[in-house]
Amino acid sequence: MNLICSILPKKEPSYLKLWRKQVIYQVLTDRFALDEDNFYAKASGNLYLGGTWKGITRNLDYIKSLGCTAIWISPIVKNISETTDCGQAYHGYWAQDMTQLNENFGTEEDLKELVNAIHEKNMLCMVDIVVNHMGHAGSKPVNFLLYQPFNSGKYYHNWQFVQNYDDPHETITGWLGDSHVNLPDIRTEKNEVRKFFQNWVSDLIKRYQFDGIRLDTAKHVEKSFFPTFIEAANVFTTGEVFHGDPKVVGDYQKYLPSTLNFPLFFQLRETFLDPKHSMFSFYDKAVLDVRHYFKDVTVLCNFLENHDFPRFFHETKDIALALNALTALIFMDGIPIIYYGQEQMFDGGSDPDNREGLWKSKYNTSNPMFRHLSSMIRTRQNLVETYPEFTYVLSFQLYIDDSVYVFTRPGVIIAISNEGSTSSFKVEIDLKEHWKEVPSSFTDILTQKTIPCKDHKLKIKSKSGLPKILISSDPSFL
C-alpha cells in the first residue's frame, strides 16, 4: 500500500463497515422543513417554528442532491411543554416522557413513513437519544411524578449543578442547565434504569428501523452504562463527549463504537479561523494525537458546525477558508457530518441564532457553496465505491509547512491552506518517493482543470487560497 497507514478490518460489528461509507446530514427537526412550503414563515427564535417529520420526508431529495447518504434527526420523545426563559423544547433535549413521541413533530405513522422513505432512497437514519437527563422549567422544586418512566426522586441524583466539567464524579452526578431550565440527572448507574434503557432502545430500533444513534451528553454518563446499552441497540452509536482533549475523548472509545470528534472540531475552528495557527500544530493535534488516543479513528464522526456553536460564517465571511475547512472535514480520516444550513452559508451566532429555519433558503441547490460542497461529497462517495480500502486506509502526509498541508488517501490528493482568499500557494511533490506507479495527470474537482504530472513531480498551485482536490486519472496509482 506504499507507505499509507491503514487500520485493517478486524472482527467487528457489520454496522461499522456500513457507517464508514456515509456522509451524515444533521437535521434539527423543528428547523428543517414545514408540512407545507412557506418560504416566508418565521425562521428564527427559541420557540417551536413548525418543522416536522413530514416536512423532512417531503424534502429528502434536497439532502440526496447534496450527496449525503445518512440523516441524523433530533430526539423524538415527548418534551416539557412550558415556555421557559430559554424558550421551548423545540430541539428535543428536555424530555418528559420517554414512552411517548413529541407530537409537535408528528405522529408515529409520520415517523415510520420518514424512516421508510429514507431507506427507499438508499439512505440511513440516525436518531438522537438522551439517557442522561430529563427537562425541568424554572427554579421551583421538581415534581418527579410528571416524568415517565422515572417518576420518583429515587431515580435522580441529588440536585447540584455541575461546576467543574473536568471533575469526573461531578460531571457524572451533577445536573446540567441553570435556574431557567435545569436537567434532572438520571441515576444511570442503577440496574433498573439500565434495564429500562436496554429494553427501550431495543424496542425503539425495531419499531422504527433506525440505523444508528447519536448519544447526547455521553460525557455525563458512567462509561460502564454503554456496553450493555450498545449491545441492546445493536446499531452504530456515536457519543457526544464534549471535550477538546483527545486523551479524554479517546478513552470513551473503549466503551462506545464511536464518538463525535470534538478534538478535530476545535482544531478545525482554530486553524481555519486564525492564519497564525500553524499547520504543524494542526497536524500534531488533529491527526497524530487523535490517532494515538483513539482506538479507531475511521469511525469517528467529524464536524465543523453543530447546534451548540456559532456558525463558521458567523466568525468569517471568507469563502476560501470555509472551503478549506470543509475539504479537511470531508476527506480526513473518519465520517463527515454536515450541519443543515452549512450548504446555504448560514451565519447565525450562538443558540438559537445558529438554529435557523432552512425554509428561508428556499432549498436553493444552485448557489456556489451548495455546488462546491456537493462536488466534494460526491467525490468522496465515488472514492468509497472505487477504492474498497478508502474507508479504513488512513490519510498520509505528503507535504506540510506553516500554512499548507497536503495529504493523500486512496485515489485523491488534498491540499489545504489557512491563509484565506487573499493568499496563494505553490507546492511541488515528487510522487516517486511514495508510489511505484505514478499517474500522468490529475483532475482538480473544484475547477475541472487537468494538472499534468511530469517526471513523477506534481506541481500544485492555488490562487485565492482555494483548496485542491486532485483525482488521479489512473485508478491504479495506489
UniProtKB/Swiss-Prot annotation:
Family that this chain belongs to: Belongs to the glycosyl hydrolase 13 family.
Tree of life domain: Eukaryota
Residue numbers annotated as active site: 216, 240
Record-listed substrate binding positions: 94, 133, 214, 219-220, 244, 307, 355
Cited InterPro entries: A-amylase-like, Glyco_hydro_13_cat_dom, Glyco_hydro_b, Glycoside_hydrolase_SF
Site note Transition state stabilizer, residues: 308
Pfam annotation, one family: Alpha-amylase
GO BP, sorted A to Z: polysaccharide metabolic process
Organism of this sequence: Schizosaccharomyces pombe (strain 972 / ATCC 24843) (Fission yeast)
EC number: 3.2.1.-
GO MF term list: alpha-amylase activity; calcium ion binding
Cross-referenced Gene3D superfamilies: Glycosidases (3.20.20.80), Golgi alpha-mannosidase II (2.60.40.1180)
Annotated protein name in UniProt: Uncharacterized glycosyl hydrolase C11E10.09c
GO cellular component: cell surface; cytosol; nucleus
